[in-house]
Amino acid sequence: MLSNLSVFAKIKGIGSASGLYLRQNSLFVIGDNSAYLYEYNLENKALNKIEILKGLKTLENIPKANKPDFEVLCHHVNSLYILGSGSTDRRNLMIEYQLDIKKVFQHSLTSLYAKVKTACKIDEENLNIEGAIFTGETWFLFNRGNGNANKNGVIKINGSDLTKAQQIEFTPIMLLKTDQKLVSFTDAILHENNIYFIAAAENTQSTYHDGEILGSYIGSLDAKTLHLNFTKQISATQKFEGITFYKQIKNQLQFLVCEDRDTDILETVIYKLVV
């Protein structure tokens, strides 16, 4: 682990963490194999579980073939948006959780993901949405290019309603290559005029099967042009899958990141990352 990464919190009761969002003293966390949205209070260390999927026999550590694969947790105004990756037909769900009224709404992204595949020339083996940003007018979806076609890039969708998307554009983003494996997106957030992303490399060419972890990275894109500003390794052995803004001290940016350890142990570690 490199020096700009330090342990921020250890949370018992959460398994594989795939996304997070910080709102005042509440840290919201999702897992790709969980039917809960977790709310962790940073002051009293209490963990609240919000059930966002009803009628399931298993609510945590859902088997791989059945899991919703929630890889995206993003925020706009009073809503949290939780998106499935789209990597299989079972993973096409979006959950909207309205923070002010504490209500859950479900939306199908099957139609959207079909349009994305056509417009962006991404086949079923290569669609893998791992991050999203919503500005209120535009969506940016981050496709992880860990499939055999290396379709790493940003999908820009004009309009606020994803289920009615019409204008869809794809911008391929070439990051680094390590051990002959491409580094690809695992999450992204917008801060001021820049997109900050985390990315990882794995020894696999599948959006479904995990491989040996070859490292994690942080980088930045210009929010208007999607020009790559920088990419920097933050760990050689860990796979980070979620990022949220923490604080800024002068020119120093601090983020919180979470790790998907691909185990059944219900404990997760949140790290502070300084850039």
Predicted regions located by residue number:
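Sequence/structural signature of beta-propeller domains
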Residues: M1-V275
